[in-house]
Amino acid sequence: PAVFDDIAEIRAFSKTPIDLHLITNNPEVYFDRINALEIEMVTLQFEDLNGYSYNGGLKSKMGLAIVSETDISVFDNVSDNYDFLLMMATTPGQSGGRFDKVNFRKIRKFKRAHPTKQVHVDGGVNAEVSFILRNMSVHSSVVGSYLFKDQPVGAALLNLKIHDIDSHYAVGDFMRSREEIPLLGPDNRSLTEVLQSMDDFKLGFTILENEHSEMEGIISNADLRKEVLRNDGLTEKSEGVAETPNHACSRALRQR
């Protein structure tokens, strides 16, 4: 394909990393040219693979692309062979489409299931969406039509990095649901349970609620560190260990 001639021409005057998105059911026929051109990143479109499974052969970082309708679970069985997931947030090939907000939830779900893998997003990215994606720790966003309409390219690039923006999305479009946050009731507050809750959700805090599902407080990593230091490591104090998180939470809330 002519794209490889274009890449060779770019290589002659630029060291900009290249991400090649292959939409084919037989990507291996291009492997030799990809390796010869030392393309930094290669992304395969899941819906067009038709059962093909990538098992190596390229020196590039590998990504798997999915459309909004495809569940992220398709990444689970092939995660060892890929470095990142590319979420196509609009119809592939459609320039200027609107970002599908269902992808906010998919991003959170993927990052929880695969915390060591990167998330890339392509489609519908403007200044507003870019702001949200950055706060969701998305590694890379592909921006096209937004750069070339309604404003100079330089201004558009700056807008993609601003930290204060008017949003047309509701907080509920991208906020975490109850099932996606660490919560502990009144009967599950041992030190082990608090630590396990933080680890399960890959967050630095756990929320405490009472028997009426009302919030009582928050325990953070900092609270636990302070309590460990206060109690000389909490060694051999099983009863004290069970109460320690509550004490730490109470002190933290009083200080706030």
For each feature predicted by the language model, list its residue ranges.
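N-terminal active-site wall of soluble small-molecule enzyme domains
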Residues: P1-G57
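Hydrophobic faces of well-ordered beta-strands that scaffold small-molecule active sites
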Residues: I18-L22, E40-L44, M62-I66, L85-M87, ...
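Catalytic cores of alpha/beta
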Residues: N25-E38, E69-N81, G123-S141
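Histidine/lysine/aspartate-rich catalytic loop segments that bind and position anionic ligands
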Residues: A65-D100
